[in-house]
């Protein structure tokens, strides 16, 4: 949906302007969400080419060629608007990626539902790796700077992006935040996206990898319900493993569902609270960062 309607304005901590303001000295020049809002409203007619009634009574609004329904917009118009928005975002993402590669910054985009334990995972990681890896963080939420404050309590540098009515970060926002945060060369940058398993899947931020965090309290079928996110990710972290003795949750079934969506997906089971399984994540982090550094040097 965000790829066709756009999202609300955003604010980066310490700034009074809106992201995309031409007055900012950032290397990104155009406002990200300045796409055409001519929604081709119909004159009372009601098209049915974008949804399907299944035999079980459910209604599917993903059966049109655009894969999504927007009132008053034809499927062809939806596709065009989506292309316009994503092409702008991809250009900003490519610029971010080039910057990260020049600086040797290893950027990860953490995505999940609200309450999966992303922030707790980052806090634990920063504390445990403080003598092994320099880490800075970009936090994304609709409102408050609570998560950035939690990160700063670890001693790490963090900046908060508030997206307002927007439900995901985009590459333009991240580019501004990176300019202000200025991650150290050779460091890791953790980008904690807005809690949402839908919209962030389509938006490349320039990261090396998307990491999807799934709490064991969410259900084994979550990868099948929200396939785009799991298809876009390189690593799935099953968090809150300390709760498994108290839940009717089949870890193997959940992983199998995720691999049905994305056969190349790597998976880890951890508890950010107790530390169980975290060393495996740290090993993945260090190996992935080293591989990325080698590829950057070769390129």
Swiss-Prot record:
Deletion consequences: Insertion mutant lacks any hydrogenase activity in symbiosis with peas, but is still able to synthesize the polypeptide for the hydrogenase large subunit.
Compositionally biased tracts (Basic and acidic residues): 31-57
Residues annotated as binding Ni(2+) 1: 2, 5, 7
Sequence segments annotated as region (G-domain): 107-268
Source taxon at top rank: Bacteria
Renumbered residue ranges of the record's region Disordered: 18-57
SUPFAM superfamilies attached to this UniProt entry: P-loop containing nucleoside triphosphate hydrolases
One function term, GO molecular function aspect: GTPase activity
Keyword GTP-binding: yes
Binding positions (Zn(2+)): 167-168, 199
Binding site for Ni(2+) 2: 167-168, 199
GO biological process, one term: protein maturation
Keywords: GTP-binding, Hydrolase, Metal-binding, Nickel, Nucleotide-binding, Zinc
Function recorded in the entry: Involved in the maturation of [NiFe] hydrogenases. Required for nickel insertion into the metal center of the hydrogenase. Exhibits a low intrinsic GTPase activity, which is essential for nickel insertion. Is able to bind 4 nickel ions per subunit. Can also bind zinc.
Entry note about domains: A histidine-rich region at the N-terminus is proposed to play a role in nickel binding, both in solution and in chelated form.
NCBIfam families per UniProt: hypB, PRK10463.1
Protein's recorded name: Hydrogenase maturation factor HypB
Organism: Rhizobium leguminosarum bv. viciae
